[in-house]
Amino acid sequence: MNKLDFQKKITRLFNKKHYADIKKSAPYPFTVTYHTGSLETPANSIESINAALNDGAEILEFDVTFRPDGTAVIIHSGSPSQTEGVLLDEALAAVAKSDKCKINLDIKSVANLPEVDRLVKKNGLFERCFYTGVFDYWVDTVKKNSAIPFYLNHKITSEEATDKNAAKALAQKAIEMGVIGINSNYKTASKLFVDTMHENSLEVSLWTVNKPKNMASVASLRPDNITTKKPHILNDMK
């Protein structure tokens, strides 16, 4: 038994013991995004992409930025050198081998977004791509330079997590921005917040939930998506 098969076996045994309550509850169709570097692969690599695809990922994520000459690459740094990063074109070509998997393009720079659009269209993936990493100060730039839909990156405040009016105010702001929904760290999310976004036709994506002890509670909030480096555990909860 190789290391990956052993990991799958252990996580399934863990789930059977600790997550029976989730299985008994009414199913909720959240997606699981494979964070770049999942399945013990190097982050922002073709190896990571292929591993996620071979594992049947619904959505995979990698970071997108630009070299000084504007070349689009996948790497976490927002300002790589002229020789750093894997070409975005190569990464997209790898995903294009799948006819289903969607891509979360986590942008670290907005320096040359038209190039991202060009490469996404070239690889026939426009209907399967969306941005995260878009904070409010980047929204106008993204809308002006790219046709790819996006989530608003937002840290949920304690008021937004507990007060419906505050959550509604954020929802209205998000609607005016024209975003798909809210992408946020799971630690400050609440059921009230998620429900309020859903009432306003906005999706909620929560990141990055890697500890098994946190997964059941996050899933119980009923987000639309959960991003993780431990996808087998979350997939077994669905």
Describe the residue ranges of each PLM region.
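Phosphate-group recognition and catalysis centered on beta-loop-alpha active-site segments
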Residues: 1-238
